[in-house]
């Protein structure tokens, strides 16, 4: 009694709370929220595939519980179910969706499913677990181990993945086309390089002539080094394959022009045609040597008459005398009389040969 008298507010507060709670309960028992009533009655009629819906679907409405604001909290965002395309993509790669096969620890909270059931445009409720190929346990409807038929796989893919698949098919087709192209082997390139070198030398063309001729004929100028490396098989396989058809065309044209002066002149004009080395017989060379000892610098008339007698070109005779004089200078030390001077003193020289 003393305790009650010392604290008169305790009795008042406890009694008032009891009466307040009882009043609320008495008011809440006959009255139900219209929205709550309709949704609860409606949810009871929805088939749930053998899994009855818990009471938290009804009691977690925004007007039934002040804690319904947690529906927009980060905890609720972690339990957002994946879309149709994500679930179907997971079925294709043989992975079970973690949101379907494992329950989140927050599912026991009464406010986890605070939002109302999702409805489509026709007004029918959409079951989250009724995705094609999935059940509530995350297994596949058609057996649980094999993927869906391949006919629907491409259509169910994401547009980006579907486009990537199409590009992959096109890429494989292009690779198949490139593989069909005729590519010479290393043995064929080696044989062609050997044959090309033999034919080029036989026709009398230098490597530089071939490079310039390719530039004039086909618009691709190649240096002498490139042709040399091709013949020596020192280029890469890719460059050898590129250069082979050009050299083959040039070789065919050069072979077809054999015996035709006009074609030969045309090819010679395209490149620097190397002059053939003049070979003089030993008997002819002896006659020229004897004439050189008599007159190292013959006149133009003497060169012409000597060329006619030896059946040589005038230019060949003139060049031979020039080269012979240069050789005489290299062989004779400075200050010593040259050989033609010694010979001129011992033998009477021809008066028509004069020093110029």
From Swiss-Prot:
Positions with biased composition (Polar residues): 118-134
InterPro entries in UniProt: HD, Homeobox_CS, Homeodomain-like_sf, Lambda_DNA-bd_dom_sf, POU, POU_dom, POU_domain_TF, TF_POU_3
Superkingdom of source: Eukaryota
DNA-binding region: 273-332
Residue ranges, annotated region (Disordered): 97-187, 328-356
Main location: nucleus
Ubl conjugation recorded as keyword: no
GO biological process: brain development; regulation of transcription by RNA polymerase II
Compositional bias per record (Basic residues), positions renumbered to this chain: 97-106
UniProt xrefs under SMART domains: HOX (SM00389), POU (SM00352)
GO molecular function, one term: RNA polymerase II cis-regulatory region sequence-specific DNA binding
Residue ranges annotated for the POU-specific domain, each copy included: 181-255
Family to which this protein belongs: Belongs to the POU transcription factor family. Class-3 subfamily.
Biological role stated in the UniProt entry: Transcriptional activator. Induces neural-specific gene expression to act as a key regulator of neural differentiation.
Protein name per Swiss-Prot or TrEMBL: POU domain, class 3, transcription factor 4-B
């Amino acid at each position: 009694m003393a305790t009650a008298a010392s604290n008169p507010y305790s009795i008042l507060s406890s009694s008032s709370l009891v009466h307040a709670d009882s009043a609320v309960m008495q008011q809440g028992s006959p009255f139900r929220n219209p929205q709550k009533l309709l949704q609860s009655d409606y949810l009871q009629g929805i088939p749930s595939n053998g899994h009855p819906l818990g009471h938290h679907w009804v009691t977690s409405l925004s007007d039934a519980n002040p804690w319904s604001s947690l529906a927009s909290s980060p905890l609720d965002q972690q339990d957002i179910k994946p879309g149709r395309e994500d679930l179907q993509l997971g079925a294709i790669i043989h992975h079970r969706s973690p949101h379907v096969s494992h329950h989140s620890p927050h599912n026991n909270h009464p406010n986890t499913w605070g939002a109302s059931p999702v409805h489509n445009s026709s007004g029918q409720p959409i079951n989250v677990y009724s995705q094609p190929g999935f059940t509530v346990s995350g297994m596949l409807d058609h057996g649980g181990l094999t993927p869906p038929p391949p006919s629907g796989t491409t259509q169910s893919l994401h547009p980006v993945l579907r486009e990537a698949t199409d590009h992959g098919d096109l890429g494989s087709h292009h690779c198949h086309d490139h593989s069909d192209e005729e590519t010479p082997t290393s043995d064929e390139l080696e044989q062609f390089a050997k044959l090309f070198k033999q034919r080029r030398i036989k026709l009398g063309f230098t490597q530089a002539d071939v490079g310039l001729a390719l530039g004039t004929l086909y618009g691709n100028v190649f240096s002498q080094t490139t042709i040399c490396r091709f013949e020596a098989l020192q280029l890469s396989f890719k460059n050898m394959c590129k250069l082979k058809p050009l050299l083959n065309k040039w070789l065919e044209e050069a072979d077809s022009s054999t015996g035709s002066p006009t074609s030969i002149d045309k090819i010679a004009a395209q490149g620097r045609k190397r002059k053939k080395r003049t070979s003089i017989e030993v008997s002819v060379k002896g006659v020229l040597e004897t004439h050189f000892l008599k007159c190292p610098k013959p006149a133009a008339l003497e060169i012409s008459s000597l060329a006619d007698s030896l059946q040589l070109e005038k230019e060949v005779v003139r060049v031979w005398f020039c080269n012979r004089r240069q050789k005489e200078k290299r062989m004779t030390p400075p200050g010593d009389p040259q050989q033609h001077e010694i010979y001129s003193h011992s033998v009477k020289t021809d008066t028509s040969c004069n020093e110029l």
